[in-house]
Every structure is written in structure tokens, then in C-alpha cells.
Amino acid sequence: PHDSSLWVPDWIKLHPSIENESLKETMQWGSKGQIDGASYNWHKKNDKFWEQLYEQIPNMKQLYFAGGEATIIEEHYTLLEEVVKAGYAKNIELRYNSNGVEMPQRLFDLWDEFKNVRFHYSVDSIGEMNDYIRFPSKWDHTVKMFHLLDNTGPNVEVTVACAVQALNIYYLPDFVKWKLEQKFKKINLWPLGA
């Protein structure tokens, strides 16, 4: 459950069934059993953090969002809006590593305000294999997001960030073939990759 709140329900069920006490202690979550999701919401009640972050907007050159799926977190949008409101967006590059779970028009409208956006789209295969590796993603939705990203503004660069692994190694040629057949205008253009 350290890496994803989606694992918390499974952890609640599985952890009590571990019989080896040494293993059970080793596998204990860092917050010593607090598996209610509270550690994923530390930012919700931390006004001082947000005040200090907003004070730094004039000094920012880049904001990098990796993990936690920024595109589904309201505070991500609030931060981007604060940067735009402060008048510094054209000086700042945005970077993302994301599986593109949700990308509303609001996001693309905000991106238009920034100097540059580099979106590294985490996709590891096609079809059912993608759905399995990137659960709970659905391939049809992933394809839709590919096309939305391919039609973003000129300040947006998009690359596919594929994690080569045992589950997809034999399917990578199919993935590359599919991607090339799409004839995307901007996704992984040379020299960024094929």
C-alpha cells in the first residue's frame, strides 16, 4: 500500500493472514498499521505547506509531477491556477509522468498558459495486456488519451514512457507497430524515440 492507495483494500485483507511474524513485521506499512489512506492526504490540512509553495512561484522554473496521478488531484489544478494568476506561467516548464487516467479540458487549457509541458505517458502494452499491467486502466480510454495528447498545443511535448518488464517484453513489437500505425503528429517524434 506504500505505492498506491488502490492497494489498501487488498492489504487490509491480506496482512492479517501472514503467519510468519518476522515477515509480517517486515511487510508492515511504514505508518505502522495506519492503512486508512490518511497518509495519502497529508497535503489536505497543511496550509503552511501551500503558503510556502505559493511564495516560491516567482522563483520557479519547472514543476515536475511524478506519481500520485496529479491529473486527478484537485490541488494540482489549484497550483497551476495560482501560477497563472501570479503571472509566471510563461516562465515555467511543467513535467509529468502519468498514466493519463483523467485529463479534462481544464488541464489542456491550463497547459496553454505555460512555457512548455513535457508529458511522459506511462503505457506498457496494448489491449488487454495494457489493462492487466496498468490496472485499472482500459485500453479504449488509453487510446482516447493518446489522441487527445496528440492534439495538444504547440508548447506540449509527449513521449511514451514504457517500462520494459517480464509481463510485456514479448508484446513490445506489437506495441511499437501499433504506435507507428497511428501516425501521431507529436508523440515521440525523432529524436525523442520511435
State each model region's role.
Residues 2-47, 57-74, 84-106, 112-144, ...:
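Core AdoMet radical
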